[in-house]
């Protein structure tokens, strides 16, 4: 899937969500071309094993927005069919929207889940998943 094709799919997936979820998401959804290696990635055998698929940002000069990393999707899921890639993209987008909604509500449930995932990852308790990467989690 090219970046232009992914942008079209991302636009379609964004339209699936109710308008109310976009409250205070003033920076929208941004698709970036790069892959983003997680700061927690364990490097071995000349490769990284944890990449960030998406991020939610809130506050600051840019306001609230969601970043999706095309390069990370290609690195991890580049072997998938377009339909399966769309499923992974949908899952990530909804994960980031959950961060947005929980942040507005003052809830830290998903943040705690992500922290638990990272603890397990750093302890080596997670199986390898994906084509070129390790554990899969949308942080």
Model region roles, listed by residue range:
Residues 1-88, 103-139:
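Metalloprotease/metallohydrolase-associated module, dominated by Zn2+-dependent proteases
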Residues 91-104:
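Active-site recognition of the HExxH zinc-binding catalytic motif
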């Amino acid at each position: 899937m090219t970046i232009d094709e992914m942008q079209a799919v991302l636009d379609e997936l964004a339209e699936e969500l109710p308008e109310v979820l976009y409250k205070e998401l003033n920076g929208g959804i941004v698709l970036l071309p790069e892959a983003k290696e997680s700061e927690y990635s364990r490097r071995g055998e000349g490769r990284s094993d944890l990449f960030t698929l998406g991020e939610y940002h809130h506050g600051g000069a840019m306001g609230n927005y969601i970043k999706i990393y095309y390069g990370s999707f290609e690195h991890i899921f580049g072997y998938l069919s377009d339909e399966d890639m769309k499923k992974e993209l949908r899952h990530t987008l909804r994960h980031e929207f959950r961060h947005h909604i929980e942040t507005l509500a003052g809830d830290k449930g998903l943040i705690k889940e992500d922290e638990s995932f990272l603890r397990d990852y750093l302890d080596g308790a997670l199986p390898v998943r994906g084509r070129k990467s390790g554990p899969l989690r949308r942080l």
